[in-house]
């Protein structure tokens, strides 16, 4: 059924997502970075991820 195929697609997408290490998606504050989008939270300053102000 259509319901089944939708569930299968979702499952595949989930499996693909979990295979990636977290580091490829974002990096924690204090870790070296090149672009802000690499950081889990906050901007990339002086080559390192800094926590966003709300985290302090």
From Swiss-Prot:
User: Which family does the record claim for this protein?
Assistant: Belongs to the conotoxin O1 superfamily.
Organism listed in the record? Conus bullatus (Bubble cone)
Q: What name has this protein been given in UniProt?
A: Conotoxin Bu12
Q: Disulphide bridges in this chain?
A: 26-40, 33-44, 39-49
Signal peptide start and end residues? 1-2
| Protein origin, superkingdom | Eukaryota
Transmembrane region(s) = none
UniProt note: domains: The presence of a 'disulfide through disulfide knot' structurally defines this protein as a knottin.
* Keyword set includes Magnesium: no
Please list the residues that make up the propeptide. 3-25
Q: Where in the cell is it found?
A: Secreted
**Tell me, what is one Gene Ontology molecular-function annotation carried by this entry?**
toxin activity
**Keywords recorded for this protein, A-Z:** Disulfide bond, Ion channel impairing toxin, Knottin, Neurotoxin, Secreted, Signal, Toxin
Q: In which tissues is it expressed?
A: Expressed by the venom duct.
In the UniProt record, which is one GO cellular component term?
extracellular region
């Amino acid at each position: 059924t259509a319901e089944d195929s939708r569930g299968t697609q979702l499952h595949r997408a989930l499996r693909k997502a979990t295979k990636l290490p977290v580091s490829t998606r974002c990096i924690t504050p204090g870790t070296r970075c090149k672009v802000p989008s690499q950081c889990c939270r906050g901007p990339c300053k002086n080559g390192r991820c800094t926590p966003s102000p709300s985290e302090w």
